[in-house]
Curated annotation (Swiss-Prot):
Gene: ilvD
EC class name: lyase
Keyword Nucleotide-binding: no
Native source organism of the sequence: Polynucleobacter asymbioticus (strain DSM 18221 / CIP 109841 / QLW-P1DMWA-1)
Alphabetized PANTHER family for the sequence: DIHYDROXY-ACID DEHYDRATASE DAD, DIHYDROXY-ACID DEHYDRATASE, MITOCHONDRIAL
Record protein name field: Dihydroxy-acid dehydratase
Disulfide topology: none
Length: 564
């Protein structure tokens, strides 16, 4: 029988480890504890953001359940960045970087202390992929516990979420909203703890982790403030101890087939563009053969069957009441769009987990549809290619009145410059805004363009203006927007060669993003282009810029390292 402390005994057994044990005795350990599995609890609690401010109760529940199940819990902290608070500022450059820092910090503690398993608890966007990357890297038994969604806010009879506040800025600047109502939206959009409530990035990733098999059924759509979320954290800890006993490891669960399941669910629920970047990073960490083209392959197979914000109607709490991710998965499974034989952290297969879930969603709900009555016949996250982005870029293409647009480029070398022009109402119908030098290396950090896109929506330009960037978009973004353009401007990608007024085409049907300039002219501009000086030469952002891969490879920092 496998020893449950197979890893941790490296620091607890033998005469030579007497000093090591002394450190544990200082924290109240007893001799009998050294034969128990030592399980880390990666606790993302902080008062930086409502996404993470409700995590301590989940960590406490996990610790209690671990100890009751015969493990010894070891709690350590992981950092977070609030995308909603950093949005539109230089601070947002740290958001994607924090994904790498979170993965690194968990790897440090799990491997540095020889932990036998780990419960990862996170809330805000980058907590999710950062934690999963660490689980894939370390490959010790692990489970992901999502902190839970926020509940909707209300003002003047209207249901609100954080994107309501971003869009209200544009409504105010265009004279469509009073200052009093702007303040009202601001104060009521976020009523308590939990991650942003639509199918934005955090809820997209939590849903995908449930489909991946690394989180418990129904856990991804629970509200943070509800008692069932605490109970789910405790159950997750108990399940993790069983995984330690059975030596069930992340790479047994995270396979190409289970990633296909996860991406199928992302398409079905209308998830965030960031999921493309993050699953490229997760599969890289798990050493799975996965490329940006795999998303397009699955998009063509899987319809959108869940009506969720930002482009739809409902929030995660509504999805939970309608049957949650298991209901979505059962519909996909019955339609031959999921692999039912994939193992989950529970030890059961996907098919076994979904055995008792109804094949048809309840008639009294409107959130989840059937395959023969989808919102859209194909998925919404399309991979566009063309001379602007030969490596591929990402667009949300469903729900657009005008899936194709050709117009004059309005070129900005930073988000800040673009936002100033939008706020000054200098962007008009038919324009295509180009925001560049915001890529992994050039930004650095691929800031999310929620502030400019929301301002355009608030000004009534969401359907008539295109936006192209080598940065990212928030999960709350909608409209004719294309992100993750690769190669990025900083390395001389064609996006760096677009001039003000150039004709640019975005065609969702043809999956095309094109600069309508002759090849000879592009070659001439490329020969004249000079790489700008890096914006940072010391510190974390400089380190990230020097190590980051292309967005088409996940913008990770441990790929193709020069170790000579």
């Amino acid at each position: 029988m496998k020893r449950l402390n197979e890893r941790s005994r490296m620091v607890t057994e033998g005469v030579a480890r007497a000093p090591n044990r002394s450190m544990y005795y200082a924290m109240g350990y007893e001799e009998k504890d050294f034969v128990k599995p030592m399980v880390g609890v990666a606790n993302g609690h902080s008062t930086i953001t409502p996404c993470n401010s409700g995590l301590q109760k989940l960590a406490d529940a996990a610790v209690e359940a671990l100890e009751a199940a015969g493990a010894k819990a070891q709690v350590f902290g992981t950092p977070t960045v609030s995308d909603g608070i950093g949005m539109g500022t230089e601070g947002m450059k740290y958001s994607l970087v924090s994904r790498e820092v979170i993965a690194d910090s968990i790897e440090v503690c799990v491997n540095g202390l020889w932990q036998d398993g780990v419960v990862v608890i996170g809330g805000c966007d980058k907590n999710m992929p950062g934690g999963m990357m660490a689980l894939a890297r370390t490959n010790v038994p692990g489970i992901y516990v999502y902190g839970g969604t926020i509940k909707p806010g209300h003002f003047k009879g209207k249901e609100l979420n954080i994107v309501s506040a971003f869009e209200a800025v544009g409504e105010f600047t265009s004279g469509r909203l009073s200052e009093e109502d702007l303040k009202g939206v601001e104060q009521h959009a976020c009523p308590g703890s939990g991650s942003c409530g639509g199918m934005y990035t955090a809820n997209t990733m939590s849903s995908s982790f449930e489909a991946l098999g690394m989180s418990l059924p129904y856990s991804s759509t629970m509200a943070n403030v509800d008692a069932e979320k605490v109970a789910s954290a405790a159950e997750s800890a108990r399940v993790l101890v069983e995984a330690v006993k059975n030596n069930l490891r992340p790479r047994d669960i995270i396979t190409k087939k289970s990633v296909e399941n996860a991406v199928s669910v992302i398409m079905a629920v209308g998830g965030s563009t960031n999921a493309v970047l993050h699953f490229l990073a997760i599969t890289s960490a798990a050493e799975i053969d996965w490329t940006i083209d795999d998303f397009e392959r699955i998009r063509k197979q899987v319809p959108v069957i869940v009506d969720m914000k930002p482009s739809g109607t409902y929030l995660a709490t509504d999805l939970h009441q309608a049957g949650g991710i298991p209901q979505v998965m059962k519909i996909l499974l019955d339609g031959g769009l999921l692999h039912g034989d994939c193992i989950t952290i529970t030890g059961k297969t996907i098919a076994e987990v979904l055995k008792d879930v109804p094949s048809v969603p309840r008639a009294d709900q409107k959130v989840i549809r059937t395959l023969d009555n989808p919102l859209y016949k194909q998925g919404h996250l399309a991979i566009l290619k063309g001379n602007i982005s030969p490596e591929g870029c990402v667009a949300k293409i469903t729900g657009l009145k005008n899936p194709s647009i050709t117009g004059p480029a309005r070129v900005f070398d930073s988000e800040d410059d673009a936002m100033a022009a939008i706020m000054a109402q200098k962007i008009k119908d038919g324009d295509i805004v180009v925001i560049r030098y915001e890529g992994p290396k050039g930004g650095p950090g691929m800031r999310e363009m929620l502030a400019p896109t929301s301002a355009l929506v608030g000004q009534g330009l969401g359907e008539s203006v295109g936006l192209i960037t080598d940065g990212r978009f928030s999960g709350g973004t909608w409209g004719m927007v294309v992100g993750h353009v690769a190669p990025e401007a900083f390395v001389g990608g064609t996006i760096a060669l677009i001039n003000e007024g150039d004709s640019v085409t975005i065609d969702a049907h043809q999956l095309l993003i094109q600069l309508n300039v002759s090849e000879e002219e592009i070659a001439k501009r490329r020969a004249a282009w000079k790489q700008p000086k890096p914006r940072y030469t010391r510190g974390l952002l400089a380190k990230y810029a020097s190590l980051a891969s292309s967005a088409s490879k996940g913008a990770v920092t441990d790929l193709n390292l020069d170790l000579t």
